[in-house]
Amino acid sequence: MIEDLWIIFRFLSVGILMLNVSLEDYRHFRVPGRSCLLLGCIGILDSIWMERSWVDCTMGFFVVSTLLMVLYISTRGKGIGGGDIKLMAVSGILLGCMGNILAFILACFFVVILYPLRKILFPSRKRLALGPYLSLGIMLTHLWGNNIIQAYLSWPGI
């Protein structure tokens, strides 16, 4: 019973936080630090409650965020923002290593699909807010990540 309440709380909280991140980043091009902090706290509590591996949470924290940090440094902050790095780091605590990689791949997929459409509809907006796409990838992975990973691994030849 309590475990079910925790799962409901976790899904609702992550959904609200991702909506907040999406709207704030879309409007003002910044990812709220408090949302990242709360997401990290939920990830830590979830890893304790569900008895997930600390190694997986730590790897999830570093794998994608390190790649984004390299991108940030190599473009001198013009290619990606620090808030996007923070968001993917703390989502790694919640999703684990494979889940965070999947969330990032889904976000990149949505950018590739939706960015040309956005360019046609809103040609005056030059900058791209990555937060909404990252949030979508995080939410989809949070909801169906294990199913997506299992479906991928069950393909013949993999």
Q: What is the predicted role of each segment?
A:
Residues 1-158:
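A membrane-topology feature that recognizes alpha-helical transmembrane segments
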